[in-house]
Swiss-Prot record:
Keywords: Oxidoreductase. It comes from the Archaea. The gene is porA. It is an enzyme of class 1 (oxidoreductase). Heterotetramer of one alpha, one beta, one delta and one gamma chain. Its EC number is 1.2.7.1. This is Pyruvate synthase subunit PorA.
Length: 396
């Protein structure tokens, strides 16, 4: 029988790793994700998890050790955040290019400078082009579930790409919620044994991995990574369906909330989706025709789902805890690209919110709604990017 425990998202991530039975875990502690490797090391030390826990001197070494272990043919796991993920950047491309299905948990945290240990999505968003799949959890239960799903998709022979699962720093990593821990036997049925056919060590059949590619072959190598990410879209849907059948919890690439008759649909990710849904309920009671959409899978980007969502709205409003310096928020930019060739599309407006752990309040969402309502009334967007909750007196 599944058991329910009250735990932080960090603990939920550690439990997910335990349930997945990786053979090698390599990690270096960093706020706010430190508890993840701590808890896993306890599982290993207590004999609850049969695995090699590698203590390393940096995040660069942690991901490098995982690459080596995955290349040897075993299931691997790591965890990090913020500057730690940034330090891994070089090796993230290598993991994807070598088609190694490593799974990594991320306590989403702002990047320096200035130093900030609180939440936004900039760390993972900055890695969106590395070839890693990206999942974002709204709550602690999703942190556990999405790690299991990430393994299922990553290890599928149609995909064979690494995956990261993000959950908001402190808002989730250090906040306790009830979490259902599934039966080990059911997880074993869901994931199965990892038996790679492309990456392994066999003295009788030596192979070279990650070798030099001349111009005559490099482009084809990059294409296969892109193609695998495209195939992952279908595999993710299949994994979601199987997960629901076995565990009773439903996931979608984009989860909609009260969008059926909405004129304005707000789009976001992570724990902010919970706040947004509460606010939507309040606005509905006040007579506003608003809805919400939560992106669970950011890479591969849910192009078709965004197009279907756009058909329901007159205005798509994006709430983003990230900023692409020199353009807009990343989700807004990607959604704009997804809709560029559509003959009919809604007005689109982007809101930058909550950077560095700043609270996103109902009053701020009201401000965003006012701007979106103005665009709806006038039939045009005055400013595509809007900073909400900014202390303007400090920047002028």
């Amino acid at each position: 029988m599944p058991i329910r425990k009250v735990m932080k998202a960090n603990e939920a991530a550690a439990w997910a790793a335990k349930l997945a039975k990786p053979k090698v875990i390599a990690a270096f502690p960093i706020t706010p994700s430190t508890l993840i490797p701590e808890k896993i090391s306890e599982f290993v030390a207590n004999g609850e998890l049969d695995a090699e826990f590698i203590k390393v001197e940096s995040e660069h070494s942690a991901i490098s050790a995982c690459v080596g272990a995955a290349a040897a043919g075993v299931r691997t796991f790591t965890a990090t955040a913020s500057q730690g993920l940034a330090l891994m950047h070089e090796i993230l491309f290598i993991a994807a290019g070598m088609r190694l299905p490593i799974v990594m948990a991320i306590g989403n945290r702002a990047l320096s400078a200035p130093i900030n240990i609180w939440n936004d999505w900039q760390d993972t968003i900055s890695q969106r082009d590395t070839g890693w799949m990206q999942f974002y959890a709204e709550n602690n239960q999703e942190a556990l579930d999405l790690i299991l799903i990430a393994y299922k998709v990553a290890e599928d022979e149609r995909v064979l790409l690494p995956a990261m699962v993000g959950f908001d720093a402190f808002i989730l990593t250090h906040t306790v919620e009830p979490v259902e821990i599934p039966d080990q036997e059911v997880v074993d049925e869901f994931l199965g044994e990892y038996e790679p056919k492309h990456a392994y060590i066999d003295p009788a059949r030596p192979i070279t991995q990650g070798s030099l590619a001349f111009p005559a072959h490099y482009m084809e190598s990059r294409y296969t990574v892109w193609e695998a990410m495209e195939r992952a879209k279908k595999v993710i849907d299949e994994a979601f369906a199987e997960f629901e059948k076995k565990f009773g919890r439903k996931y979608q690439k984009i989860e909609e909330y009260k969008t059926e008759d909405a004129d304005i649909i707000f789009v976001t990710m992570g724990s902010l989706a919970g706040t947004l849904k509460e606010w939507i309920d309040k606005k509905r009671e006040e007579g506003y025709k608003v809805g919400a959409a939560k992106i669970t899978v950011y890479r591969p980007f849910p192009v078709e789902e965004i197009r279907e969502l756009a058909k329901k709205a007159k205005v798509l409003a994006f709430l983003e805890k990230n900023i692409t310096i020199g353009l807009y928020g990343a989700v807004f930019t990607d959604a704009s690209a997804a809709l560029i060739n559509e003959s009919e599309k809604p007005l689109m407006v982007d809101f930058i919110v909550g950077l560095g752990g700043r609270d996103v309040t109902f009053n701020q969402l009201d401000e965003a709604l006012e701007i979106a309502e103005k665009a709806l009334k006038e039939g045009k967007v005055e400013n595509p990017i809007n900073w909400i909750g900014l202390r303007w007196e400090l920047v002028k």
